[in-house]
Amino acid sequence: MSKNKAHITVNDKKIELSVRKGTLGPDVIEIASLYKETDTFTYDPGFTSTASCESKITYIDGNEGILLYRGYPIDQLAEKGDFLESCYLLLYGELPTKQEKIDFDRCIMQHTMVHEQFARFFHGFRRDSHPMAVMIACLGAMSAFYHDSIDITDPQQRMIASIRLISKVPTLAAMAYKYSIGQAFVYPRNDLSYAANFLRMCFSVPCEEYKINPVLTRAMDRIFTLHADHEQNASTSTVRLAGSSGANPFACIAAGVACLWGPAHGGANEACLKMLQEIGSVERIPEFIARAKDKNDSFRLMGFGHRVYKNYDPRAKIMQQTCHEVLKELNIQNDPLLDIAITLENIALNDEYFIEKKLYPNVDFYSGITLKALGFPTEMFTVLFALARSVGWVAQWKEMIEDPAQKISRPRQLYTGYAAREYIPIDKRVN
């Protein structure tokens, strides 16, 4: 390979391909001309070696354990800023000035109300419906309630839709939770912070005044920030794929929520908590460690390893600290699940098997314990993930729509089915 070119030979035909260099990360070989030049496609199941787009939003270095939003390390954003500051950063590319932050916060909080007909919309679901099923429906329904902001060719409508999604998803998520437990919906309060408002909508009841706890509010805000974006993962790619067809933003985000519901993607923290409950006690950990190492055993240690990170997940360190702060604030001492988690973490960081396979604790490892301590049932965990990730999806969708090189996505395939064959009348068919 030359400095800016790659050469490939297919069936004795040699072609030259351009090599593009990003700000960070591996170089990328442009293969758009490959089919035209050689009548061949590339084959990359799961897109593990394929850059599907050009983006300026989020960067991950899995080998070094680095996650950047617009160039800023995730730990600095989570510890020094707040979620809406990260929202502004992801949407506009720069951290806001003091006045820009005030104006943006006010804009978001002024749009937290949802159409009153949504209350009746919820009553169309069974009470025991999974909150993610309800969220998918609600996000799709937003295009019916807010059809004045679905023209993707209008920059003003794109921005209005973006603001509405970021501001209203917490309200819909809280309504989904309240509906599932048979309690009255709680209207948002615009004088509260984003995280405090969400916690109040989830946990306040008419019979007593809800008191804002700054430690729990800060924990919720950090969880939102840590999950705001994560490059071109399955759900983000789904949003981009749907958006490439010209679908309205509400439909695209609903598609992202549907993808996130998959247990291999957004359900990891719920699965991790269930695993800790299955282990039950510190004394049983060796048994489950042995099972995890046994290739013939289907058991997997959830919360360890990551498809991208081959080092310690930078979000996990902040999540661990946040978890301890919440447990201390709520005076949860000697929590058996936390004891199991800490013991498992120590084993993973010192056991040769885990070190060799680079199975480090990820963000899901501690987030499940934290969310449980905050009072959320496991069915709400992925809903909270979707709430936080909405801003990342919106930023990625907006970037894609505004890219002049954008075109409808059309993946290819390696076809291994039958070649053309003649139709056989039904009375002449045999097994």
UniProtKB/Swiss-Prot annotation:
GO terms for cellular component: cytoplasm. InterPro entries: Citrate_synth-like_lrg_a-sub (IPR016142), Citrate_synth-like_sm_a-sub (IPR016143), Citrate_synthase (IPR002020), Citrate_synthase_AS (IPR019810), Citrate_synthase_bac-typ (IPR024176), Citrate_synthase_sf (IPR036969), Citrate_synthase_typ-I (IPR010953). GO terms for molecular function: citrate (Si)-synthase activity. The keyword tRNA processing does not apply. The active site is at 306, 364. It holds the Pfam family Citrate_synt. It is an enzyme of class 2 (transferase). Pathway: Carbohydrate metabolism; tricarboxylic acid cycle; isocitrate from oxaloacetate: step 1/2. Its EC number is 2.3.3.16. Belongs to the citrate synthase family. NCBIfam families: cit_synth_I (TIGR01798), PRK05614.1 (NF004126). Citrate synthase is found in nearly all cells capable of oxidative metabolism. This is Citrate synthase. It comes from Bartonella henselae (strain ATCC 49882 / DSM 28221 / CCUG 30454 / Houston 1). The gene is gltA.
